[in-house]
Amino acid sequence: MSMTEALLHKRLAETPEMEPCDGVKLLYQSRFGCGHLLPPDGQLVERIRAEADELPENAALPPFTFIGNGLCRMNLAAPAVRALPPERLARMMTLTAEDVPPMQPGDERLPGFEHDLSLLRAAALAGRTLFSAAALDGYLAEYRAAGYPPASHSPRYRTAYRPAYRVISGDFAVLLPLLSAIEDRIAQGKPALAVLDGPCGSGKTTLADRLSRLYGAPV
């Protein structure tokens, strides 16, 4: 079983109220990120702030839900995420969109997405979803004809899970404890110095680059 298939099965088990559009949205985001062009930074920050202000805190919700291909959903109701300033969350989104752009005509990622959709259909045939393979086929016929647009969550899914998240790089999830410590230092008006240690090939350079781009700081 591939990592994508295993992760898909895990998410289907965690959120069994998924309808075809919800499953497609999950797989779409794992390939194409947020799937649309982001507004200017100021608007992005205000949208995040406004949505977070309306959300009740949910301590049972994990800060991040991994969706595959190095991406995750950052859950805005999770306490650890709410503790970060909206400006930082917006910057995470912008950096992720730079690395994972929206789908384009003739996108080379489309065959991979189609493969993922075949895994979703196999899951439906195996009884892992509440919707049938026939229902998924009907949805996908219209979806493909429309040019593979970003999908929206179903009313059923929204009622069951109240999704409120942003799609970002999974590297930021790994960095969360460090980000929290850095933000504490910044809030106190103190300088922050981060030291990343680990064996060769463990990802230190990648994470250092993420930090540098996130804060505009030298490495």
What name fits each language-model region?
Residues 203:
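Conserved glycine(s) of the Walker
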